[in-house]
């Protein structure tokens, strides 16, 4: 029997989400594809999407490290908008929040952006619901533009943070 971990399969669309990128952009081990399917479906349903109105995800292939063996995936867009654009919207909302003097206004601003911003919501869903790799001596393999402020491993290098400013990376 072949090693199940060596078989690479595309990340499949779910009921409430669609993979909009070509299948070869996310050829992963079955374990990673299944974990992504579970988390993406839960994220999509919680964000209000369904079979009649699915959310889209766009993957791009990576070329180093875990990507070489299908153990890592990079998500570049959710809902047709790039992760970098979602991050820019998040930062703009927080800048507006810093100008708010009223604690109630603060809660409204952060709450509204947290509901609207699919990039941030996706990062938090991947963080909360996924089981990602953590090689000995290394951080949990979830990186993206929110890692320094929201991530499970906030003390990452500038180089690593900069490399993941426009996408979310997970590995299993």
Regions found by a protein language model. Give the residues of each.
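Active-site acidic/histidine clusters and adjacent loop/turn architecture
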Residues: 1-52
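Cell-wall polysaccharide-cleaving catalytic domain and substrate-binding groove, primarily
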Residues: 54-73
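Active-site proximal helix-loop segment of RNase H-like, two-metal nucleases, encompassing DDE(D)
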Residues: 76
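Catalytic cores and adjacent binding grooves of peptidoglycan-active enzymes
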Residues: 5-7, 23, 46, 62, ...
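Intrinsic-disorder/low-complexity peptide segments enriched for small residues
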Residues: 34, 38, 53-56, 124, ...
């Amino acid at each position: 029997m072949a090693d199940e971990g060596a078989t690479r399969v595309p990340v499949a669309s779910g009921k409430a989400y669609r993979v909009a990128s070509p299948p070869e952009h996310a050829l992963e081990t079955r374990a990673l594809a299944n974990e992504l399917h579970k988390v993406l479906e839960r994220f999509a349903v919680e964000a209000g999407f369904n079979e009649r109105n699915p959310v889209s995800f766009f993957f791009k292939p990576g070329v180093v490290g875990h990507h070489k063996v299908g153990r890592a995936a990079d998500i570049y867009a959710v809902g047709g908008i790039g992760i970098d654009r979602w991050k820019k919207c998040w930062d703009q909302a927080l800048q507006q929040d810093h100008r708010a003097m009223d604690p109630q206004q603060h809660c409204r601003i952060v709450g509204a952006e947290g509901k609207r911003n699919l990039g941030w919501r996706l990062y938090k869903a991947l963080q909360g619901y996924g089981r990602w790799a953590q090689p000995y001596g290394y951080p949990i393999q979830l990186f993206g533009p929110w890692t320094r402020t929201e991530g499970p491993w906030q003390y990452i290098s500038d180089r690593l943070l900069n490399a993941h400013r426009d996408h979310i990376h997970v590995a299993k």
